[in-house]
Regions:
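N-terminal secretory signal peptides that target proteins for export/translocation
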Residues: 1-2
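Sec-dependent N-terminal signal peptides
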Residues: 5-14
């Protein structure tokens, strides 16, 4: 963005100067001073010619009579100081030419006479230290050029005067260490560049100076190990990148330092085992992924650490057998899942293993007859359900 803006400024200058320097079909009979007038007779311009070519001083005026520009030509080309003014008489710019080419220091002003730019040229090419300003007078950009190409450190500032970035250039390419700053003036990032692309180790920071993210770039892409931190310096994420995407195991950490999650990735997608943990470090959830979709057996663990639920996934949807367990590992209940909903017969069990209920589900709701048993195995109740609503209960005669 910064380089494009600079190019635009240079383009305007080059275009404006070109208009004055060119004369496609000179009238070779013109000699001496030539005056051009507005319709009301006021002088519009005063120019000097020699054998049809502009030579000597010239002046141009606004319709109100104020001076628009003043300069000099030699053999049809701008030579020496060239100044231009706004219609109210305030200075617009001052430039210097040698043989029609910009040379030396050029200055441009806003209409309130606040400096807009100070540029240095060497035969039409920006050269040396150049400065650009906001309308409030604060410095906007300070850039170093060598024969028209950016070289060395260039700095960009916010309108309030605080530093925005420092960029190192080599032969018109961003190269080496560049820095970005937050609006409060604190260092936000340190980037390494190689020929306009981020390349090598880089860091971002919180405004308290603590490292926020450590990463490595290669040819503009995130590659290799990366770490993220909280403002207090505690590790929050460990990841590996390949071509800007997660690759391998990604780990997240809780504020207390315990592992929050770890998941395997391939080509930026979850692939393989993923686990999530509770604040106390005990495992909570466990899934298997294939191409970023849950696939295979998944487990959920109770806060006490024992296996609580087991379910099968296919293409990110529950399908197959789902089981619930007691804290002693005994089966508590089992369902058949189809497209994410309970369907078909289900049984629940006492902790000691005896059958507690026999149920039937349809589209995720109890339907039909439900048998409830005593621990002894004797039938206790017979309930009737429709779409999850109990319609009746019959006490067993046994």
């Amino acid at each position: 963005m910064m380089r494009k803006g600079l190019f635009f400024l240079f383009f305007l200058c080059a275009t404006g100067c070109w208009v004055y320097a060119q004369d496609a079909s000179p009238d070779t009979t013109l000699n001496g001073e030539v005056k051009e007038r507005f319709d009301d007779g006021k002088v519009k311009s005063e120019k000097n010619y020699h054998h049809g070519q502009l030579n000597g001083p010239f002046r141009e005026y606004y319709p109100n009579g104020n001076l628009m520009s003043v300069g000099s030509y030699k053999n049809g080309q701008l030579q020496g100081a060239y100044k231009s003014y706004y219609e109210d008489g305030s200075e617009y710019f001052e430039k210097n030419y040698i043989g029609g080419q910009l040379y030396g220091t050029s200055r441009e002003y806003y209409e309130n006479e606040v400096p807009k730019s100070v540029e240095n040229y060497y035969y039409d090419a920006l050269n040396g230290f150049n400065q650009y300003y906001y309308p409030n007078g604060n410095l906007k950009m300070a850039m170093n050029f060598k024969k028209g190409k950016l070289n060395g450190i260039s700095r960009e500032y916010n309108e309030d005067g605080s530093l925005k970035n420092e960029i190192n250039y080599d032969d018109d390419h961003i190269d080496g260490v560049s820095k970005e700053y937050a609006s409060d003036g604190s260092l936000y990032a340190i980037w390494n560049y190689k020929i306009d692309q981020k390349d090598g180790p880089s860091k971002t920071f919180y405004n308290n100076g603590q490292v926020q993210w450590e990463m490595i770039f290669q040819n503009g892409n995130l590659e290799g190990p990366s770490k993220k931190y909280a403002q207090d310096g505690k590790l929050t994420l460990e990841a590996n990148y390949k071509n800007n995407q997660f690759e391998g195991v990604v780990k997240e950490y809780q504020a207390n330092g315990n592992l929050k999650s770890e998941c395997s990735y391939a080509d930026g997608k979850k692939d393989g085992e993923c686990r999530q943990f509770r604040d106390n470090g005990k495992q909570w959830l466990e899934w298997n992924y294939k191409n970023n979709l849950k696939d295979g057996v998944a487990h959920e663990y109770a806060p006490q650490g024992y296996l609580w639920m087991e379910v099968n996934f296919k293409d990110d949807v529950k399908n197959g057998i789902m089981k619930e367990f007691y804290d002693n590992g005994a089966l508590k209940q089992q369902w058949i899942i189809e497209d994410g909903m309970e369907n078909g017969p289900s049984k629940s069990y006492y902790k000691s293993g005896e059958v507690m209920t026999e149920e039937v589900y349809h589209n995720g709701r109890l339907n039909g007859v439900v048998h409830l048993y005593h621990k002894s195995g004797d039938l206790a109740y017979i309930d009737t359900y429709q779409d999850g609503v109990k319609l009746s209960r019959q006490t067993s005669s046994k």
